[in-house]
């Protein structure tokens, strides 16, 4: 008699995705981040649900309700700290997951890659609206600055901004709708993740060599389920350590001050995981140009599969492309640093140079290097 997990209508879907899934035997620890992102999403949804039970989306009580959660709710301080720092861990895993895809040429599975880029945009949007909810100074001014960017679009800009605000400034209507979006979007992300996984399992995973692995596959369980479990434990230990020992390490001190529309903080900056994009936005003096550069800094990922010129899939056997990949990583770190600095010399110039290098690497250097590597391989 056949095993129930292979015959039951629901169980066989789970079986095909997580138990008997044929997996390349040589995938490294860099392939752990997909499941870690799933863990992050579940953690954020659960902690967020418990926070939403005690939070009030009203400008007169939002800040106080967060203080109430931390002071009076059973383990409220822990739930909030895990939720706030969980976002940072989410983005660490996201950026590493995208970097792995870039390095090993996983972007050649175009549907999976494009859904992944959409997931990245959705997650960034969710994190942005979530940052507004505690209604501290940086929440309020961050919301004001970023939503105001939409006014750069010709003709419809001002109407668009007021439509998003629900009035003539960031006010109660804005907070209420941002809370609604912040509650809804994680479930949209969960749905899109299912599609991401479904599309991935049509082709199967890539592997570090970039070669076809049909000849050497193993079942996902027990080999990679335990490998993922080890990753889960490591990440949860890291997250709980940050949440318990230094919960405010990655936050902004300005957000401990209730929002005041009459006092602007000296340096308005987003959370650390948006600083690279913020630096690109600030490096262009023109408002519309800055907004387009900000959008394109993420959407450029969608062009990567089209700009792939090499005959080899990954960077494993391509030293020149490896150098450029690590140059891109270094450039993003420089942009992250610049995004947190004030708008003054020499930071403005460094930001402009780093932004130019960022786009030049994606659009010119990487495709050109791939083409040159092909030439070198044919050279005799």
UniProtKB/Swiss-Prot annotation:
Binding site for heme b b562: 83, 182
Keywords from the UniProt entry: Electron transport, Heme, Iron, Membrane, Metal-binding, Mitochondrion, Mitochondrion inner membrane, Respiratory chain, Transmembrane, Transmembrane helix, Transport, Ubiquinone
GO biological process, one term: mitochondrial electron transport, ubiquinol to cytochrome c
Details of cofactor binding: Binds 2 heme b groups non-covalently.
Keyword Membrane: yes
Residue stretches spanning the membrane: 33-53, 77-98, 113-133, 178-198, 226-246, 288-308, 320-340, 347-367
MF term (GO), any: metal ion binding
Location in or out of the cell: Mitochondrion inner membrane
Main location group: mitochondrion
Gene3D superfamilies registered for this protein in UniProt: Cytochrome Bc1 Complex, Chain C
Mode of membrane association: Multi-pass membrane protein
PROSITE patterns: CYTB_CTER, CYTB_NTER
Cofactor: heme b
Role according to the record: Component of the ubiquinol-cytochrome c reductase complex (complex III or cytochrome b-c1 complex) that is part of the mitochondrial respiratory chain. The b-c1 complex mediates electron transfer from ubiquinol to cytochrome c. Contributes to the generation of a proton gradient across the mitochondrial membrane that is then used for ATP synthesis.
Additional notes on this entry: Heme 1 (or BL or b562) is low-potential and absorbs at about 562 nm, and heme 2 (or BH or b566) is high-potential and absorbs at about 566 nm.
Name of this protein: Cytochrome b
Underlying gene: mt-cyb
């Amino acid at each position: 008699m056949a095993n129930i997990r292979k015959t039951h209508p629901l169980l066989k879907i789970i079986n095909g995705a997580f138990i008997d899934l044929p997996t390349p035997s040589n995938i490294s620890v860099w392939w752990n981040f997909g499941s870690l992102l799933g863990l992050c999403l579940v953690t954020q949804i659960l902690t967020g649900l418990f926070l939403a039970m005690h939070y009030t989306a009203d400008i007169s009580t939002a800040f106080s309700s967060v203080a109430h959660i931390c002071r009076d709710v059973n383990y409220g301080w822990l739930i909030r700290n895990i939720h706030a720092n969980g976002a940072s861990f989410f983005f660490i895993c996201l950026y590493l997951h995208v970097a792995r895809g870039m390095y090993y040429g996983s972007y050649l599975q175009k549907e999976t890659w494009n859904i992944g880029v959409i997931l990245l945009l959705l997650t960034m949007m969710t994190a942005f609206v979530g940052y507004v909810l505690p209604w501290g100074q940086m929440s309020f001014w961050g919301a004001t600055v970023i939503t105001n960017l939409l006014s750069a679009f010709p003709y419809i800009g001002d109407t668009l901004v007021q439509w998003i605000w629900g009035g003539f400034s960031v006010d109660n209507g804005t907070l209420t709708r941002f809370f609604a979006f912040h509650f809804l979007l994680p479930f949209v992300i969960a749905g899109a993740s299912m599609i991401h996984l479904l599309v991935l399992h049509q082709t199967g995973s890539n592997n570090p060599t970039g070669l076809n692995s049909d000849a050497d596959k193993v079942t996902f369980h027990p080999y990679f389920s335990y490998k993922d479990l080890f990753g889960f434990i490591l990440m949860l230990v890291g997250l709980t350590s940050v949440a318990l020992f230094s919960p405010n390490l990655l936050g902004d001190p300005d957000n401990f001050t209730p929002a005041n529309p009459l006092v602007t903080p000296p340096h308005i900056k987003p959370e650390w995981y948006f600083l690279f994009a913020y630096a690109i936005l600030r490096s262009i003096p023109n408002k519309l140009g800055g907004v387009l550069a900000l959008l394109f800094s993420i959407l450029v990922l969608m062009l990567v599969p089209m700009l792939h010129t090499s005959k080899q899939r990954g960077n494993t056997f391509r030293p020149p492309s490896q150098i450029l990949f690590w140059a891109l990583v270094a450039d993003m770190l420089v942009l992250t640093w610049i995004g947190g600095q004030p708008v003054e010399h020499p930071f403005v110039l460094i930001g402009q140079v780093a932004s130019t290098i960022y786009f030049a690497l994606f659009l010119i250097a990487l495709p050109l290097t791939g083409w040159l590597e092909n030439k070198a391989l044919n050279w005799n």
